[in-house]
Amino acid sequence: MICLKVKVNPIPYLLAVAMASNIGSACTFIGNPQNVLIGSLSQVPAGEYFLSAAPISFLGLIMLYLAISFKYKNDLLVSFEYKSDNNSIIHKYLLSKTIIVLALVIIFYLVGFDLSLTASFGAAFLLINARIKPERVYEDIDFNLLIMFIGLFIIIAGVEKSGLLDLINSFLPPEYMKEIPLFSVMAIVLSNIVSNVPAVLLLRYYIPVDEQILWQALALLSTIAGNLTVFGSIANLIVIEIAKKQGIKVTSNQYLKIGFPLTILLSIISIIWFEFIN
């Protein structure tokens, strides 16, 4: 919206939002849906994972900034002036309540409470006590996106019941899956075929609960892999859908020119990090 108002090319900003949300969310267990799932399935402490993933995540954000600045340097050098809409309504009371509830959810999760329960109670509290009618909240739900993911989860359930995983196991013995490079490649490829959340649902069967380093690698690499293609993560799809509603088309080619080399390079660094350094 802001880019359209000031008449600048919105593509670099949209790419930055989508890719930065993937890279930034990789450093915690509450940053995205697949990491929440991994946090609940594994025995990895949230603080330990943050210390392990944060350096890669911060490095990735720097690399993203440099890549977009180089690719779109002419578009980003354009000067503009933006005047905010004075008629915009800010619910200060609701904003303060939301910040407090969010902080409490994070604190409860860090001390050991189940994230899904604390987040659900927090959301229910805000929905009940908000001065905004629930109907207005429901209007902003992207049901098309939800239906698409429901379909993906149904496909994953079909794969689980079909015996395909047993067939894969016959070609790839479990001890091979403990090799970080091979496991990382599988996570990256699967994340861009069925998206990262369904990929985690499939790959969880190959990781013993006590293999903390593999859980950490899966959380970090399945999220970073979301930047490889447009279909790699839900964040990409949300950004593209919102842009489309504003008449802006983000093409796969535009995304690949930044996302593909960035993801490959950052994935190699991540594998080296987990294999030799961390």
Predicted regions and their residues:
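Transmembrane helix-bundle signature of multi-pass membrane transporters/permeases
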Residues: 1, 15-25, 53-58, 154, ...
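Hydrophobic transmembrane alpha-helices that form the pore/transport pathway of multi-pass ion
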Residues: 1-26, 37, 200-220, 250, ...
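Small-residue-rich segments of transmembrane alpha-helices in multi-pass membrane proteins
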Residues: 16-28, 85-94, 145-159, 215, ...
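Transmembrane helix boundary and interhelical junction motifs in multipass membrane proteins
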Residues: 29-35, 117, 192-203, 230-238
